[in-house]
C-alpha cells in the first residue's frame, strides 16, 4: 500500500507461502495474526505497527481491507507478550491457526 509498509494481497501471499514452506521444512517459525484496528485509519495502524513489531515482521492487507501480520521467528510461547503489546496499541488480534488465503479464506 502506497505510503505504508503494508503489502498488497498478492505480495503478502507470496511471503506467507514462503514462511509456510520454511516452517514445513523445520527451517523457520512464524505466527499469523489478523488485526482489527477499530479506532485507526490504515495509515495510523501502520504507524502503530512500526513502533510495536520488528523490522522483519510482515504486514499485508486483503482485498476486503483485512490487516494481517506475519510474526517471523515467533512461536506460541512468546505470543502473549506480543498480543498484550498490540492490544495496548489499540489492535484487536486474532491468531490464524492455519495458513489461509487472505482473500478467499481457503487453506493453502
Predicted features along the sequence, with ranges:
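Regulatory and interdomain segments flanking nucleotide-handling catalytic cores
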Residues: 1-108
Amino acid at each position: 500500500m502506497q505510503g505504508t509498509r503494508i503489502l498488497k494481497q498478492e505480495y503478502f501471499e507470496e511471503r506467507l507461502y514462503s514462511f509456510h514452506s520454511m516452517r514445513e521444512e523445520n527451517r523457520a517459525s512464524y505466527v499469523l495474526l489478523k488485526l482489527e484496528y477499530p479506532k485507526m485509519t490504515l495509515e495510523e495502524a501502520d504507524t502503530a505497527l512500526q513502533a510495536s513489531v520488528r523490522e522483519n515482521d510482515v504486514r499485508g492487507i486483503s482485498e476486503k481491507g483485512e490487516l494481517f501480520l506475519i510474526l517471523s521467528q515467533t512461536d506460541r510461547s512468546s505470543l502473549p507478550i506480543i498480543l498484550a503489546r498490540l492490544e495496548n496499541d489499540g489492535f484487536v488480534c486474532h491468531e490464524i491457526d492455519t495458513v489461509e488465503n487472505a482473500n478467499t479464506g481457503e487453506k493453502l
